[in-house]
Amino acid sequence: MKIRPAEARDRERIHEILVATAHFTEEEVRCAMELVDQAHDEPEKGDYFVHVLEEPDDGPVQGYVCHGPTPLTDGVFDLYWIAVDPKQQGQGIGQLLLRFVENEVRRKRGRMLLIETSSKESYASTMRFYERSGYDEISRIKDFYRIEDDKVVYCKKLTPS
């Protein structure tokens, strides 16, 4: 498997993965795709970086990740989106994508990676994934997204490489 910058040809597959996960609302999928488009259309801005993980020899894309620097901070980055084809989940693809982003952040002299997620029951495995990956829950805003759906913020401090 290899991780590479997303290209225009990956857009449809990224959309398919987001829809197939069944975690995201239509509005969330639209938001995620806006970041994919912005990363592709305005790379010089450096606001968003999108990468895909594909099988060797240009095989199908199995997952994608989007991250970028947090505005008005020194060395803080956000993981905006991470999604893996549901048929491929549990095979370490999410872990590979997350470690890739951590290494990219270190390479860019980043010191902290933040992840925001929902507290909905359907996200329980996602939250366990972040915790197993060394992220600490640092904030929880009750009823942020909607009643009984908190915003949970995870953080991992990184040592720049």
Language-model-detected regions and their locations in the chain:
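Conserved G/P- and acidic residue-centered "switch" motifs that form tight phosphate/ATP-binding loops
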Residues: 92
